[in-house]
Amino acid sequence: MESPLWVRWLKVYAVGGVIIGSGALLFKYTTPTDEQLIASLSPELRLQYETERKLRQAEQQELMKIVQTTAESDQPIWKTGPIKSPWEKDTETVQQKEMFQKARADVAQREELQRIRKELAEIRQKSEQKTQEIVNTKSWWKFW
């Protein structure tokens, strides 16, 4: 005999609750705390973490100041002010990158031109030497 519809839905909700509850319990008891995670790091990484903690705290305080000034202003939230939006292209960085690549290309081009000029000078010098040798060894006034 088939069970009533409400019993089947009760089973569905009970199984769903067990799945969600077991997931939450697993997450709670298997995820390490911050102290456990730091203690499990190697000594070098732990030292690096400790030295950079003050820097991260200063960054966080600076961010909170910016957030407070942004919250006090009458401008819309999408005008981020001193904070650069991740969706806006950072034109300054792009320009610096282009200038760096252009300067590097100019240096490479100058070096290539110097190398070519040096090779050309060597070829001209060899050509002049060969011409002088031919002129010195050949008598131009003899017909035979």
From Swiss-Prot:
Pfam families found in the cross-reference section: CBP4
Keyword hit for Repeat: no
TM ranges: 5-27
Membrane topology: Single-pass membrane protein
Main subcellular location: mitochondrion
Subcellular locations according to the entry: Mitochondrion inner membrane
Keyword list, A-Z: Chaperone, Coiled coil, Membrane, Mitochondrion, Mitochondrion inner membrane, Transmembrane, Transmembrane helix
GO cellular component annotations of the record: mitochondrial inner membrane
Coiled-coil residue windows: 106-139
Stored InterPro entries: Cbp4 (IPR012420)
Domain of life: Eukaryota
Gene Ontology terms describing biological process: mitochondrial respiratory chain complex III assembly
Protein's UniProt keywords contain Lipoprotein: no
Family statement drawn from the similarity comment of this UniProt entry: Belongs to the CBP4 family.
Function recorded in the entry: Essential for the assembly of ubiquinol-cytochrome c reductase. It has a direct effect on the correct occurrence of the Rieske protein, core 4, core 5 and apocytochrome b.
Protein name, per record: Assembly factor CBP4
Source organism (scientific name): Vanderwaltozyma polyspora (strain ATCC 22028 / DSM 70294 / BCRC 21397 / CBS 2163 / NBRC 10782 / NRRL Y-8283 / UCD 57-17) (Kluyveromyces polysporus)
Lineage: Eukaryota, Fungi, Dikarya, Ascomycota, Saccharomycotina
